[in-house]
Amino acid sequence: MAKIVDIKGREVLDSRGNPTVEADVLLDNGIIGSACAPSGASTGSREALELRDGDKSRYMGKGVLKAVANINGPIRDLLLGKDPVDQKALDHAMIALDATENKASLGANAILAVSLAAAKAAAQDQDLPLYAHIANLNGTPGVYSMPVPMMNIINGGEHADNNIDIQEFMIQPVGAKSFAEALRWGTEIFHHLKAVLKARGLNTAVGDEGGFAPNLASNKEALEAIAEAVANAGYTLGTDVTLALDCAASEFYKNGKYTLSEEGEYSSAEFAEYLAELTRKHPIISIEDGLDESDWDGWKVLTEKIGEKVQLVGDDLFVTNTKILKEGIDKNIANSILIKFNQIGTLTETLEAIQMAKAAGYTAIISHRSGETEDSTIADLAVGTSAGQIKTGSLCRSDRVSKYNQLLRIEEQLGSKAVYRGRAEFRG
């Protein structure tokens, strides 16, 4: 049995030029696992705490030296001599040491970086690909599937400096026969969308997640531009390719109203109908955070209205937290959960959220954050849990493409075992 002999944390940069945490876990046989914690822009109020220094003289207060010190001090002392393969024991030990509900003492960014680095070291120690080790931890050894990518090709909201309220407009190549083919379709549509926007005299600069960030007259105009790009690429909208939205509605929910910059104010029931109308006019099969995280009555209305046909995803709503997810399941709120492991802070708790969702008939979507690094762990997480869906941005920026490239490698490695289910992963 290999043992942990050293743990080292360091401050590195994420894709937005902000500091984040990287951790190395060294085993007594010389193996090193390394991992970085991502960081979000639009965040749920109940997410685990990302520990920042608050020292305005360094990185405008966004430094993470406190989190790094927690890795190099108490976390290192706690885990020295431990078995890296026993992920639950490592994660539970860190949770107990932190002893807060939201990991505010050590920082979820510190705990997560070590949790993932240990998993990577354990995978290497067993001579396993990371996705195979994750499948073992998940209790589903040897069971894999390739995820349908939800490609964010128009960015708005908190992810871009433009006038679009809805944060993400995504395409899903559900008609493809493999992940590699899905990636090609998405890339071709992405390039055709650039041409469509240019022809309209619109900006083709990209947002945090690599999608275009033009100033469009309305959210509906964004959908029309995507439809044109899909057709120009030679694909059929609704069969080859479907659409998905991330409203991030908490960002434009004020005083009990949903305020769209170009389209006015809506009550909860009115905004639920606004979204339902979009699904009637466009082949939108997934809507994330369609209502505010605190507007559970509104979520109930939306779920009853379109939940049978449309995947309704809780991100800010559930924050990868099993306690909150269980409440949602019990109340029939939404029917899907977005999985972001930095919202909860350990690999073990992330797997528990995926398992709870699947047991209740909810789908689980593995997701990046807007502040990413070259770390591609979420690709292995998606395959190793057979989650079926992944959100990792657009088709440019290496912080996004690194995940797609890792999925290509995994699909090649799995060969005939690489199942891509396409439309079967979704409701309706």
Curated annotation (Swiss-Prot):
Annotated Mg(2+) binding sites: D246, E288, D315
Keyword GTP-binding found: no
One Gene Ontology cellular component: phosphopyruvate hydratase complex
PROSITE patterns, per the entry: ENOLASE
Record-level GO BP terms: glycolytic process
UniProtKB keywords: Cytoplasm, Glycolysis, Lyase, Magnesium, Metal-binding, Secreted
Biological or metabolic pathway of the protein: Carbohydrate degradation; glycolysis; pyruvate from D-glyceraldehyde 3-phosphate: step 4/5
Annotated active site: E209 (proton donor), K340 (proton acceptor)
SMART domains: Enolase_C (SM01192), Enolase_N (SM01193)
GO molecular function: magnesium ion binding; phosphopyruvate hydratase activity
Signal peptide coordinates: none
SUPFAM superfamilies assigned: Enolase C-terminal domain-like, Enolase N-terminal domain-like
Function (record text): Catalyzes the reversible conversion of 2-phosphoglycerate (2-PG) into phosphoenolpyruvate (PEP). It is essential for the degradation of carbohydrates via glycolysis.
Subunit structure: Component of the RNA degradosome, a multiprotein complex involved in RNA processing and mRNA degradation.
Name this polypeptide is given: Enolase 1
Organism this protein belongs to: Pseudomonas syringae pv. tomato (strain ATCC BAA-871 / DC3000)
